[in-house]
Amino acid sequence: MRIALLTYSTKPRGGVVHTLALAEALAGLDGLDVHLWTLGRGGDTAFFRPVDPAVTVHAVPFPDLGDEVGPRILRSIDTLDRAFAAERPAYDVVHAQDCISANAAMRSGPCVRTVHHLDTFTTPELVACHERAVVEPVARVCVSAAVAAEVEAGWGLPATVIANGVDAARFEAGGRDTEGRARWRRRCGRYVLALGGIEPRKGTLDLLEAYALARREVPDLRFVLAGGETLFDYRDYRAAFDRRAAELGVEPEVLGVVAHDALPSLVAEAAALGFVSTQEGFGLAPLEALAAGVPVVARDLPVLREVLGDHVAYAATPDAIAAALLDALAAPPDPARGRAHSHGFTWRRAAAEHLAFYRALG
């Protein structure tokens, strides 16, 4: 079976992390020839990390023209479509991982789509992209039952639930990386960590407010943010974040994208991970933190209850988030339970379930 997985970026966003790990796990199964298609934005010719050579990577050049979000979405679809359509007949399965790659793939034939989470957009081009990528694929995968229920409620469409895996061993090893952790400790001190950038969906302003409250009790506590490479324009939200930080008299450490090899020790050295997204599809970052032995404070969402169970603290407001962070700092939970929970999510299991899904398509 020859499989094409398509994603919109080479950067370390959650959906891209998923796509790489799934491709490698599928390539480890007998009889599968796995190809990974992506847009190489800004001159990228490879993904943010090395990819198993058993996976064939096709990075389609996508120069930065400085265009606005709407035109950039349409150009992304056009560019990926032109490159992929000529090779499409070689594949038995075409599997898109986001709305851009789904729209590109469906121009030349049917595809299946993983709905990682549902978004609410205002840019007309994105609204249309999102809608078509939910409605028109021949079949859908969702990474959680909560998202599958949203798809059913919103569109009356069924989806197969296949949970993500997590590279738990990698983040558990981060806890043993004494040199790496020491480097982060020298740079950042004692810190609450947020992963995923400064974005509305990530609830970053709420976490900022919570951090400022917690800092009144723990004056040496720092707030560190990592990640944030995105296709979308969140400049207004970032400006609001910076203004509010200044008003609160705090100075968050914004790292941007962290090198792949340095991320596990960054996570492991954190005093706690704040994961307070207002909308999520799964939640890889908190599972990675649990694997590293780090306490997690999460927004109280059904999907996070589904994935994380009772292994994290839940909160819904800045006051409650601050209180949960302080509890985690004062009395961290036994890391063994959370670590064991994270090890229950494997990419090998996810790959086997995907293969069964592909075979059921006929």
State where each predicted segment sits.
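Carbohydrate-associated surface elements
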Residues: A146, G165
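Aromatic "clamp/platform" in nucleotide-sugar-dependent glycosyltransferases that forms part
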Residues: T278
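Short hydrophobic beta-strand element within catalytic cores of glycosyltransferases
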Residues: P286, A291, P295-A298
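Nucleotide-activated donor-binding/catalytic signature segment of Leloir-type glycosyltransferases, i.e.
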Residues: G227, R238-D261
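A conserved mid-protein helix/loop that constitutes part of the nucleotide-sugar donor-binding site
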Residues: V17-A21, E199-L213, D236
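N-terminal strand-loop element at the rim of the active site
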Residues: L5-R13, G28-R75
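Conserved donor-binding/catalytic core segment of Leloir-type glycosyltransferases
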Residues: A4, V141, R185-K202, L208-Y211, ...
